Amino acid sequence: SRGTQLIETRGHRLGQINALSVIHYADVEFGLPSRLTASVYQGGGDILDIERSVELGGSLHAKGVLLMSSFLKAHFGREQTLHFSAALAFEQSYGQVDGDSATVAELSALISAISQLPIDQSWAITGSMNQLGQVQPIGGVNAKIEGFFDACKLQGLTGKQGVIIPRQNMQHLMLRKDVIEAVSNGQFHIHAIDTIDQALELLMARPVGTLNKKGRYTKKSIYAAVMDQLDYWQAIEDGAEFEEEPKKKKKKKKDKKKAKAEKKTVATENTAEQTPETISTATTAD
């Protein structure tokens, strides 16, 4: 791409991920990594597929976005309305986009944007997904892996880069010799997954979390961060109660500090009044 395609193969970014596509030219196919981005904001729960909106996305791609939306609502919208909207886009994409092989990448970018947890740009990912979060096989896996490997090689291999693929596609691997050597030497990695949860844990380097009896996810987990942000949007939707609560807490803290300071002052004054009497009594005793 001679540096014209904006791709990052190191560092961490919010709502940004390396997706993989296949370009067919005559009888040849080659893989092309693409930057996929997600932006979120307070809204009514709509997910805008920009490719579809400008008639660059096909029906299979649109189906993938709907499946992703269904997964989000099933996981996080059982007890509350999702008060956010989002937009998804393949950056620097000027042709038709179809197929559902970017569904896992799109959902990962969206969860990163909501949770405010960055994605490791050392990884590229491909895979379709069903409503249950199970990852499904895709086509062109070899070309996709080789395409991202070439991009990493141009920017410099770090030993941390690699591609995340559906486990079912492992049987289809027939990679170039240089890619196989890089994998053998630990310079490049291929990781197989079965679920979206496994993908998120690799991309964000923390557990997704488990749901407890109270309907909350494990602290400091990916899904807990998602729920925290959704609760924040819910509080804003409910009105001024969210804004008043922190002020009340601050006032209580100030009142406690003031009472403590006054108590300390009274104690000091009492000590000051008692000290001369004690000295005087001691002198009389002598």
What are these regions (language model features)?
Residues R2-L6, Q16-N18, S34-L56, L60-D286:
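Peripheral, non-AAA+ core regions of ATP-driven protein-machinery
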Residues G11-H24, F30:
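N-terminal amphipathic/basic leader segments beginning at the initiator methionine
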